[in-house]
Amino acid sequence: MNQKILNILTIILTVILSGLQMLPNESNNVVLQWIRVYIYWIAGISAAIVIALHIIDLYRGRERHIKEWLVTFLKHILDEHLAGEIYQTRISILRVERGYKVFFKSLFYFVFSNFCNNFKNATWRNSLKDIAIHVMSDYLTVYVRYSYPKSKQSHAYFRLSDNADRNQFNGIANKCIEEGVPQFVHTVDISGIDVTQPFEKLSNNEKCKVRKYMKNSYFAPSYYGSLRLMRRISNNLYAVPIALSDQSIWGVIIIDNVSDKKCDFEKDLAPFMSSYMKIINFSLSSLKKR
């Protein structure tokens, strides 16, 4: 929970508790009479809420600090090796999450958070399509990200393919998770193509480019819809699996960039990546896998 919100709620509830002590013993006001009758219930519930909020904050505080540390560390990697001449580069950590969790997150964001925007731009149909409805599947979601320059918060998700054993993947991250080895891709740039529209409505030239991009980036044809959720479609991609101490795959780190020039992240980071991954793996070792 945001620390500022927690502090504000604590102050409000503390004021309520203090105000209860100042109530007059006798009053003709119906509301004050009701409060006087239930004063101990109100005080008890208010105190319980304050305590519960602090317990929740303590429970979630560790993960919040881990995220802050990881963002700082990702910034170090980017600034040290990938910033400057390599512009528009992002480095992200994606984690595996259960489908029902992603369902509620996507429902809240695409429907409730964008409620006014959906009415204004008549985008209800696309928003409903963007909800993660496969609640029994696993998804990859953005856990932390640092980009140069800074980008907006991402709500993209990638459903892990049920046919990965037949080389039917939902992108390079899915392939990296399934095979447990780093993956690197440099392919055609399709960032200028509007992939929010159905594939059939693309021009023949655009279809050709999108097919090539999906093939090279390990998107099976059935996962064309995944492109619509991506704020930026990069053509230089480097994925490295994140394995915990028990050798289970927790997620994947992705470095991506949009450029006609090949950005060989795998080669550039080869002398350092092993040490960096050990630090990331250790930082995430105290968290649950999903």
Please describe what each predicted stretch is.
Residues G19-V30:
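Juxtamembrane "helix-exit" motif on the non-cytosolic side of transmembrane helices
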Residues K120-M230:
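Regulatory sensory and allosteric helical modules in signal-transduction proteins
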Residues E85-V96, V185-I193, K289-R290:
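Short glycine-rich, low-complexity/disordered patches
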Residues D246-R290:
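Juxtadomain coupling helices with adjacent low-complexity linkers
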Residues M1-V15:
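Juxtamembrane interface helix immediately N-terminal to a transmembrane segment
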Residues K4, I8, S222-G225, V258-K261:
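Non-catalytic regulatory/interaction regions at protein termini and inter-domain linkers
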Residues N236-L244:
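A short, aliphatic-rich beta-strand micro-motif
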Residues N28-A164:
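Intrinsically disordered, low-complexity terminal regulatory regions
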